[in-house]
Amino acid sequence: MNKTLSIKENHLFRALYHRGKSAAGKTMVVYVIKRRNQPVNRLGITVSVKLGCAVERNRARRRIRETYRLNETRLKSGFDIVIVARKAAVDGPFELLQKDLLRLCDQLGMLEAESHE
């Protein structure tokens, strides 16, 4: 299983916003930069104060983190990833979150080619 580290430094978030590729969906926006010769992904999740009270923001963060964890093995490694939550991440169905994440990762070229064995 791939190990994912977390992004916590502000300058890394800003670098992804300015230089990274992005794709937007109903529940989230994903920003990505490919890192050279790195065996692991780094993930950062942001939720705006506009989304709601702390309970709702933390719920959105937990749901996105779990969606990523469940699909982590399908992603290529060596990326810095920032996911920005939208309102639908709080109260939308979990299946929508998963479909959205996989679709956006596919658009950004992060999905591993599936083997049909």
Which residue stretches match the model-derived regions?
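Positively charged, solvent-exposed patches that mediate nucleic-acid binding
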Residues: 1-117
